[in-house]
Amino acid sequence: MNDVLKILDRLLKKKGYVIKKHSEYNLLPLQNLQNNPSLKMTYEAFDKKEKTAISDNVSRLNICLRTCINKKRARHNYNELTGVAIDEHLLKCVRSLIISINEAVKNNKVIKLTVFDDRSDSVSLEKINSLLNILKCDWEIVKTESTGQGNSLYEHFNFAREKNSLFYFCEDDYLHIPEAINEMVDFYQGVYKEISAHLLIHPQEHELIYSQINYPSYILEGQNRRWRTISHATHTFFTHSSVVDKYWEYFGNTKYVGHKQKRHLGSEKQTTDKLFNHILGFSPIPAVAVHLQSKDSLPPFFNWENTWNDI
């Protein structure tokens, strides 16, 4: 920005305007910004004049998918939303992710999928392998060292440390639209380029965000949807390996998810939600993937039936 524009920028800022490059986001300060640390951090990240140079690799994506398809896991023989058998329900969700990965690869994204399988039965594991064979990228299946939801969470987070790439941590009951992976990569790279800082993307708005924990947000316009700033997410999210490594203290206790006596220590509130004190969080409106577990876990404005029927 030349000297004339700098002077004009200072004058216009008093009236609530900011001069920015056309392709950049322009966030305006809100009243009582000091009373909302999350919004204040978001505004300052986009308003910062001097950007910190970061050399992290954001051109490569690793996807970690946790699977566990067996009779022991299922409480019922069928899913209440789709009405199909649990194994069919989960395998179709896995297929939706594979379709989305292939769509991203068609758009020149460099991706590897690692499946962390927690004792799926032999028939289901064979079906998972068959699905993976249609992938247009590298993939592998890793048998988790210990059984249990918390152990697989801990293991796939630990896997990401020191890898220097984007990471998407996902589980087998998320239904993805074909554009999901490609759009999350594009949005992450675009924001990272503008603010020179890492972020976290939750693929859908948190199920509690309009009830128990409603709060104001910035809304950013993307190419195909809007993106809302968030301070809550599940353990399914998109970020960078350096975030996992730098803030490992917020990941270690995920091993207690599902633990009868210590499960509270592994909750999102006690673990990865603390990341939002340090990095920006976003979720797409409408969602690019949904937790297809129950009616209560669905985000608004998302027709999951159409996505389900198209697979």
Question: Where are the predicted features?
Answer:
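Membrane-proximal basic amphipathic "stem/tether" segments
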Residues: 1-46
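C-terminal catalytic/acceptor-binding lobe
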Residues: 37, 239-311
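Short amphipathic alpha-helices and their capping/turn segments at secondary-structure boundaries
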Residues: 37-62
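Active-site-proximal specificity loops/subdomain of glycosyltransferases
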Residues: 77-78, 116-164
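Conserved catalytic core of nucleotide-sugar-dependent glycosyltransferases
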Residues: 157-161, 166-168, 175-251
